[in-house]
A protein has these predicted regions:
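Aromatic- and acidic-residue-enriched segments that line the glycan-binding/catalytic groove
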Residues: 112-124, 158-203, 263, 284-304
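Conserved, mostly hydrophobic/aromatic
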Residues: 48, 94, 104, 125, ...
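Hydrophobic faces of well-ordered beta-strands that scaffold small-molecule active sites
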Residues: 44-46, 102-104, 152-154, 245, ...
């Protein structure tokens, strides 16, 4: 099929006397699709949680048939009504901030019973959540962002999905999910996969354990699961023309499959960039996950960019201290940054003060000292 010309055809599925016909189209590839420009160290990313940003279309606030049919801006765990149209309407405002890229928390369907606003329990990897808009509206947002000189980074989650995902509710095979679809909690010990003293069991629980009871853990060692996830990301790059991917919970997924994924994407799109969420408190342990890391050798993650969570911690401490000795305040940052020598590519670190999982920096004691 890789050699097939663009065309429309039908896929016919049969089971006994039952038959289902699915119309399908192999689309024409966009010119220069493989030359998509990724984000890099010269870019400033503006993080947006779509449900919390701007409501540009009130008609999609509540979609009949979806499990969470409530909008309540007084409830921090409910949906607030933000959508893709709201973001598109504010692109001039965003561009005028001086940022060069937008990082969107997940926009794919998250049809869960509660807490669906954050998007991290995907129920359909190929569809935008209808409360945000449509696939076409997402593509329009990317095109409009590009017209204003803004890149777009898409959040993806390969470690787990939501338990309302059709792939979990009707598994193609029992080994699509770890522990045969039975809930076993991860330990969240992200240092364990690189720990030379960790037992095989300890490593298995981190990687195969579920993030939560409603987030079943994909078995990426299943070649069909791996192919499904890899192809879905390539489809979004081709379809929408995004400039980057931020991969959630990167250390919780299977190392080899994620390495194959990073390699497959960057071989197809040489200038594309992927950043992994590597939430670990040590720069040495974070460096393990970066492409060509000597710490991980002979294994290679092929992940170009990692998130510098240790630097976030250091900055929150440094700005809450007096710079009056050799260790405190800005001296802390001076010494810490010199340790970036542990990274294979120190110029490919995503630096940030906070994100959607942490308190806002400007509300912390470090930013607002009490006199």
């Amino acid at each position: 099929i890789s050699e097939a010309a663009p065309q429309k055809f039908e896929i016919i599925l049969k089971q006994g006397k039952k038959q289902t016909v699915i119309p399908y189209e192999l689309k024409q590839r966009r010119p220069s699709a493989s030359e998509v420009e990724g984000f890099n160290s010269s870019d400033v990313l503006y993080l947006i949680m779509p449900d919390r940003f701007a409501n540009g279309d009130v008609s999609n606030d509540i979609i009949p048939g979806m499990l969470e049919a409530k909008v309540d801006r007084n409830d921090p765990f409910a949906r607030h009504g933000g959508d893709l149209k709201g973001i598109e309407n504010q692109l001039d405002y965003i561009a005028n901030l001086g940022v060069t890229s937008i990082w969107l928390n997940p926009i794919q369907e998250n049809d869960m019973k509660e807490g669906s606003y954050h998007g991290y329990a995907i129920t359909d990897y190929y569809q935008v959540d209808r409360r945000f808009g449509s696939n076409e509206e997402f593509r329009s947002l990317v095109e409009q962002a590009h017209s204003k000189g803004l890149k777009v980074v898409m959040d993806m989650i390969f470690n787990h999905c939501g338990d309302q995902n059709y792939l979990f509710k009707d598994m193609p095979s029992k080994d699509w999910f770890n522990f045969k679809g039975n809930y076993v909690q991860t330990t969240f010990k992200t240092a364990t996969p690189s720990d030379p003293y960790a037992s095989d069991y300890a490593k298995k629980i981190v990687v195969d354990g579920w993030f939560s009871e409603c987030m079943p853990d994909f078995n990426q060692r299943n070649r069909h699961v791996a192919t499904y996830l890899i192809q879905s990301s390539i489809w979004w790059i081709e379809y929408a023309g995004i400039n980057g991917i931020r991969q959630d919970t990167h250390p919780y997924a299977d190392f080899n499959m994620m390495s194959d994924w990073c390699k497959a994407v960057t071989e197809e799109y040489p200038d594309f960039n992927i950043v992994g969420e590597t939430w670990i408190g040590s720069n040495v342990l974070v460096s393990y996950w970066q492409k060509d890391s000597k710490v991980a050798a002979p294994k290679n993650s092929h992940l170009r960019t990692v998130m510098d969570f240790p630097l976030m911690d250091q900055m929150n401490n440094a700005f809450d201290e007096e710079t009056n000795d050799w260790n405190g305040g800005l001296y802390r940052l001076f010494d810490y940054l010199s340790q970036d020598i542990v990274y294979a590519d120190p110029m490919n670190l995503l630096v940030f003060l906070d994100n959607h999982d942490t308190s806002r920096f400007y509300r912390s004691e470090a930013a607002t000292p009490v006199s």
